[in-house]
Amino acid sequence: MLENIFHLKENHTDVKTEIMAGITTFMTMAYILAVNPNILSASGMDSEAVLIATALASFVGTALMALLANYPFALAPGMGLNAYFSYTVVLTMGYSWQLALMAVFVEGVIFIALSLTNVREGIFNAIPMTLKSAVSVGIGLFVAFVGLQNAKLIVNSDSTLVTYQHFKGATFHSVGVGAILALLGVVITAILLVKKVKGGILYGILITWLLGIVCELTGIYVPDVDAGMYSVIPTAFVSFDFSALGETFGQVFKTDFSGVGLLNFFAVMFSFLFVDLFDTLGTLIGVASKADMLDEDGRLPNIKGALMADSIGTCVGAVLGTSTTTTFVESASGVTEGGRTGLTAMTTGVLFLLATIFSPLFLTIPSFATAPALIIVGFYMMGSAIKIDFNDPSEGIPAFLTILAMPTAYSISEGIAIGIISWTIINVITGKAKEKKISPLMYVLTVLFILKYVFL
């Protein structure tokens, strides 16, 4: 049966290898179960509900990837997009999280249509390999920057925008100790990875969390709710009570549009559409590139199935109560362990489903314990930099601008926009358009991005 569904022999793999690869993928990306509630709760959403929604959305999206595309890629609510949801749409723009969920749902429906009409596939294939590699690197820096913020290793500064945390003062036993533990977590995780310990990222989270528990029990770490530093000692381990999901499930259809206006809603929806389109393509590019699954022309075979899984997963996630569901770069860890088919993804998906009963445990994991995972994931993404020809300025400069823009603009989509505009203009003006065989779609995207900056 499994052979008929996943074509194991054709892909030179077996059931044992695929299952072990799926477990490895889960171990390297399980941190999202702790990180996503931390980020989305900033928008006012119930953290326990978000955790359950995250696990269920991850299961649905990953299972669809297995069945529709037969790829060993796992999906979950994406980093970057969840930050955009909370910190930009809700906290900065002032909209409710229910309206933000509706925007995610609507753009998911639109993406289903775009996937059926090959628009998303066309955009994926039109982006040059140099920019695809740069996107992977830029996402890595962006995710690492988010990790530094979550650990409070980087804080706001009136003079320099951001600065490193000062470990002295009244908040030392809360914020300061948390930042120090995050640094230790990075070192511990790095050692585990150097020693090739499977699931080293997850073990790094658990060890850092354990150190936090020891520090709290000994009085070194003192919770400070006002500073966003909570108790790290769990009061429960398992729960079969999923009633918390009611706080977010279906709320997308109870959006209050009063005082928002149709134009304002479409502005929010378009923002999600724009960010999700290029964040998703960027992440998929990064994962496929890291896993060496792109063909010699930079195309991903059977990409339509992967995009459909992504689109449907986003709609389901919005109904459950979480931000956009997308492919995770950590899927490459399962590929490294030999995963080659959807059986790897299905294994990961089932593990996410089982994780729902451990929600009390995951909710206690502090942000300083998950931050090292984000920083290390950033390191993994940097590997694509070696594929960029920095000796050729027409290739290297647009790639550099793409990489630079993502963490500095706090936006993956802005990095892609800057990269596409600069790559097209530089190569056209220098007479390299014919040599580079620039796709007509690249010209269209360049014009659209320029219009976006002029009018939006």
Question: Would you name each region that the model predicts?
Answer:
Residues 1-49, 165-168, 205, 209-303, ...:
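Helix-loop-helix hairpins and the membrane-proximal interhelical loops
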Residues 2-36, 57, 78-87, 91-139, ...:
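Helix-loop-helix junctions within the multi-pass membrane cores of secondary transporters/permeases
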Residues 12, 16, 184, 266-270, ...:
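Alpha-helical membrane-protein architecture signal
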Residues 19, 39, 123, 199, ...:
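Residue-level signature of catalytic and energy-coupling elements of molecular machines
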Residues 23-30, 63, 67, 144, ...:
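Hydrophobic/aromatic residues within the transmembrane alpha-helices of Major Facilitator Superfamily
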Residues 44-63:
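Loop-to-helix transition at the N-terminal end of transmembrane alpha-helices
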Residues 58-79, 110:
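Juxtamembrane transmembrane-helix boundary signature
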Residues 93-210, 346-456:
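Membrane-embedded alpha-helical modules
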